[in-house]
Amino acid sequence: MSLELLSQLETKIQATLENIELLKMELEEEKQKSTQLAEKNQKLQQDLNSWSDKVNGLVGLLNSEI
């Protein structure tokens, strides 16, 4: 291989490595977002269950008064 080809190869390898590092950082950000969304989803599910229990309790009171 000529020196020029080796230089081009080195440039392409360096660019690829930089791209891989950027993708790793993006992946880490997406993992963090996913974790945050999972936590938010769990909180919303708990809120929904709480409200559902309250509504069912009120419906039960209404039914017992009828």
From Swiss-Prot:
GO terms for biological process: division septum assembly; FtsZ-dependent cytokinesis. It is found in: Cytoplasm. Pfam families: ZapB. GO terms for cellular component: cytoplasm. Belongs to the ZapB family. Homodimer. The ends of the coiled-coil dimer bind to each other, forming polymers. Interacts with FtsZ. Non-essential, abundant cell division factor that is required for proper Z-ring formation. It is recruited early to the divisome by direct interaction with FtsZ, stimulating Z-ring assembly and thereby promoting cell division earlier in the cell cycle. Its recruitment to the Z-ring requires functional FtsA or ZipA. This is Cell division protein ZapB. It comes from Shewanella denitrificans (strain OS217 / ATCC BAA-1090 / DSM 15013).
